[in-house]
Amino acid sequence: ETPSNPILKIVDVEKIAELSRSHGLVSFIDNTFATPLIQKPHKLGIDIVLQSATKYFGGHSDICAGAIAASSEHKDIIWSLSKNIGGSLSDYTAWLLERSMKTLSVRFFAQQKNAVELADYLRDCNSIDRIYYPGLTSHPGHDIAKKQMDGFGVVISFELNKKIDPK
């Protein structure tokens, strides 16, 4: 998963894909936090991409869904799992998801803009010891995120100053 939950570690997706290929392994990534709007793992060489559709894609907290996309070389793996284990959405859930997908980019990019502003604000806040957001140049994965993503996402994590009583 990159960015990871909860401290938004960034993994070099292209290097993971190359390493997997060099050892004859199938590469797999959870792209939930980035979404296909800002990170395209297939273009970076990943074979199978998992995407939760519950939060960002759904957008209204009224569905539980997910998606798996595979390269043509690996689509049979996904088809076999789907056929043998299941995984189809109900008609109604599919309709709710389709409804929400129409506004995904508007919602996501507005949230990302707010995340950038909030991260900038929190960076200068005395009550915060540490902030995790790949959009900040101080983030250890900033350069990798900048290389492989078309934005830095909407999730921010932070640690309160030890002297602050959270109660």
Regions found by a protein language model. Give the residues of each.
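Conserved PLP-enzyme active-site core in the AAT-like
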Residues: 2-127, 132, 143
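Conserved small-domain helix->loop->beta segment predominantly found in fold-type I
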Residues: 116-167
